[in-house]
Amino acid sequence: MTYESFAYWYDKLMNEAPYDAWQSFVQKKLKQYGRQGAKRILDVGCGTGELAVRLAKEGFLVTGVDLSENMLAIAQAKAEAQQVTIEFFQQNMTELEGFSSFDCVTIFCDSLNYLLEESEVRQTFSRIYELLKEDGLLLFDVHSTYKMDHIFQDAIFTSNDEEISYIWSCYPLSLPHSVEHELTFFVRGDDGKYERHDELHRQCTYEIDQYKQWLTEAGFTVLEITADFTDEAPSETSERVFFVAKK
């Protein structure tokens, strides 16, 4: 199986991801914080472009950034199929070069957790601050420390259907609040035989106060911290933490 076809199957598996909720979160926060006239959005860690395309169809001028060339190929094809214009760039989120003056920057689907060094998170916040217009918003989510330390630790998740099945195993790393994801996919080909593909991902998260400190050091004002697509503050057992920060 080529990496291009793996990106295709990844996109299929992510169909159940809460894109409606992420899209609603963006539009709600832009309105809530007086940015109804916002037009330019940078979607960092855009993957196969699902959220970027949805936002573009709502009239936003969207730019997408991702490290994976193959994911971006799917994203570009998706944008063309939906007849929307989106600029896609293959970059590490610590770089973010070649564009500026955004009303809003988003980093969803725990993409920020792929940065394993504190310096990388801080650099990313600093670059985003430079790219935002005055009063522009940064919206992002991360895995909670509870999810990393309790739900993911030594966990195994499985899924099975006729076209694609996977085994997803999680192991702790030496870093605090970090995990290694070992994913094994079995995809059925046209001949009915299954082909195996292995993926390895590492993620790390930090305490909420640490993210707040880094945002403040980068120049941001933290407006709101909530959890799990609600308006409630994070609890000890929250799994996904959302931040809203303003330049």
Swiss-Prot record:
Q: What Enzyme Commission number(s) appear in the record? A: 2.1.1.-
User: Any keyword Transferase?
Assistant: yes
Q: Name one GO molecular function term.
A: methyltransferase activity
InterPro entries reported in the protein's UniProt record? Methyltransf_25, SAM-dependent_MTases_sf
**Tree of life domain:** Bacteria
Gene Ontology biological-process entries = methylation
Is this entry keyworded Transferase?
A: yes
What this chain does, per the entry, is described as:
May be a S-adenosyl-L-methionine (SAM)-dependent methyltransferase.
> Known PANTHER family for this protein?
TRANS-ACONITATE 2-METHYLTRANSFERASE (PTHR43861:SF1), TRANS-ACONITATE 2-METHYLTRANSFERASE-RELATED (PTHR43861)
Query: What protein name does the entry list?
Result: Putative methyltransferase GWCH70_2453
Q: Which organism is it from?
A: Geobacillus sp. (strain WCH70)
